[in-house]
Design a protein with these regions (language model features):
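Short glycine/acidic-enriched loop and turn motifs that connect beta-strands
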Residues: 79-81, 133-136
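Bacterial N-terminal signal peptides that target proteins for export
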Residues: 2-16
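Acidic, glycine-rich flexible loop segments
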Residues: 98-125, 130, 134
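C-terminal motif of bacterial Sec signal peptides marking the signal peptidase cleavage site
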Residues: 23-26
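N-terminal helix-cap/turn-to-beta initiation motif at the start of protein domains
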Residues: 29-45, 64-69, 120-123, 149-151
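Glycine-centered tight beta-turn/hairpin loop motif at sheet-sheet or coil-to-beta transitions
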Residues: 53-55, 112-114, 137-139
Length: 151
């Protein structure tokens, strides 16, 4: 009886070891970079307008440096010009986003505040709107257009 119990315990241990190996393997594979399905890597010319709370023109560069599946990461650097006062400000920060439905681009730009951009991609141009909020509940919003720069 002791031998039968030992044999069952050994078999149970093997099954647990195999199951654990499969689970760990599955987890490891899911975090590996996947082939890009969107092909956004590179430099994009950014133009836009902030319509609230104060009207500003926005110009700069969106650089996509990493893609995995439908996700992407990079950096946005902008020069903002207040249309009333003429004051110029440089802002920049990291971005992360994703593509869905074949042509919808959605990304957050961590500038002075987080600005969520949602736009449609057609060929080498993305156009859309953005909205940002600060801790003091001020809401900023506007439109944007980015065009791929040729290498």
């Amino acid at each position: 009886m002791n031998l039968a119990l030992h044999s069952r315990a050994k078999r149970g241990f093997r099954l647990v070891a195999i199951a654990s190996g499969v689970l760990v393997s599955g987890c490891l594979q899911s975090t590996a970079p996947q082939p890009s399905v969107i092909q956004l890597n590179g430099t994009w010319k950014y133009t836009g307008v902030q319509t609230q709370p104060v009207r500003e023109t926005l110009t700069g560069t969106l650089t996509i440096t990493r893609e995995s599946g439908a996700s992407f990461q990079g950096r946005l650097d902008l020069v903002t010009t207040n249309e009333q006062s003429g004051q110029i400000t440089n802002i920049g920060g990291l971005i992360s986003g994703s593509e869905s439905n074949g042509n919808l681009i959605d990304f957050d730009a961590d500038l002075e505040t987080v600005r969520r951009h949602v736009g449609q991609i057609v060929a080498d141009t993305i156009t859309g709107t953005w909205i940002g909020t600060a801790s003091n509940v001020n809401i900023s919003s506007g439109t944007f257009r980015v065009e791929r720069q040729t290498q």
